[in-house]
Amino acid sequence: MLLLPAISLAVPDTLSGPEISLKDHFIVKNNLNPSARAARARSMMMPISRNVDRLAANADSILPFSISIEDTVISDLRERLERTRLPDQLEGSSWEYGTELDYLKALLDYWQHDFDWRAQESMLNAFDHYMTVIDDLSLHFIHQQSANEEAIPLLLVHGWPGSVSEFSKIIGPMADPEAHDGIAADSFHVIAPSLPGFGFSGKPTQPGMNPEKIALLLAKLMQRLGYERYALAGGDWGAIINWHLANHFPERLIGLHSNMMLAGQPDDPSQRDQIEPEEAVLVQARRAFMRNEIGYQQIQGTKPQTLGYSLADSPAGLAAWIVEKFHGWSDLDQGPDGNLDEVFTKDELLTNISIYWFTNTITSSTRIYYENRNVPASKPFGFIDVPTGAAIFPAELYMVPRAWAEAAFDLRHWTVMEKGGHFAALEQPVLYLEDVRNFFQLLRQ
């Protein structure tokens, strides 16, 4: 165990002046693209601060990027874990009060003694990462290009409490399907950004970064990358952000795939009442379940800064806050017999949690709930005239009847899955990938 002689207090950021930053703990990296290789050769001869200056000076610049967490930051994490003070738990209780104590103890012990961040860092760095600045905000993204010239550009958008690590099992098969038992016709150029305030992207310094504004930023990113038309996929906030993209720029989109469909009641009674019996049972069951799951939304939607002081300073608190969502929103028994280790490995969970910890973005990421609640969209939603496909996983948080989705979207594809939950790309990557491929095969024809 590595120890530090002193521990600095980690405090969540507050909204302040403009920020253009690559973050002190990260470095630029090489890429297969010849121009990127040349850029890397130049960048390695100058300090990080000058690379930051290059981004700030050239509004259209895109620099290769690599994740490289400093040893002292990892040591600080282990020291904090060593000093963890845990609460008690009621006898006979499990997850119904929140994160189960014995599970958290095991997770924290693994994080402190056995979790190999460098291995996970290397896994993530196997993808092609970049950084650019859009509207004075540094934006990190993976851009995994396919060798197939006919590949569809796919903007793959995560949510909360996720990150780009959610997509680590599907980016390779999407960009290079032939290397993963697929066919070249299913190729995608994958663009997977860290949302503003999440992970390796910059933190908004002014109020107002709601999902619509994020969508407009991502539209600018796709323009900067030279994609005139592209496709969308994602869940959670990613689904909502993509909804805004489709609402603003339907002419730019090839198609929209979602694993969290959202639609209100149609005005037409014939559509509103067109609910299959099995749909009604599932919708009601998920609504009942969500009544016990929305407490976090009330906190993050009203006082995210107050919550942040605890989570930014305690890795145990951060892990408990995030892992409870992975337990509650996944397809497993929610009682004492449910085993989260059978759904996600500890490495998968801790890679995502570590990204939040190392970047100190738990507070900035939760503000999206506040901004969504308090900053109305500038363009009301109408019918989404973009070919849309939906993957309906049984443990998804929100469910709508198919007829309601058809009233709101140009619905071309609807798959009801036998298993899986909210974090579909990580929990059921084979099913998720197959459904994305099947939907876009319809549009390629």
Question: Where in this protein do the model-derived segments appear?
Answer:
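Non-catalytic accessory segments flanking enzyme active sites
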Residues: 70-146, 150, 348, 357-360, ...
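Conserved acidic catalytic loop of the alpha/beta-hydrolase fold
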Residues: 212-230
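Short beta-strand element of the alpha/beta-hydrolase
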Residues: 151-159
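Conserved hydrolase catalytic core segment
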Residues: 173, 177-179, 228-276
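C-terminal subdomain of alpha/beta-hydrolase-fold enzymes, centered on the catalytic histidine
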Residues: 300-445
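Conserved alpha/beta-hydrolase
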Residues: 174-200
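Primarily auto-inhibitory N-terminal propeptides
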Residues: 11-38
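Glycine-rich "HGGG/HGxG" loop immediately N-terminal to the catalytic nucleophile
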Residues: 117-119, 195-209, 243
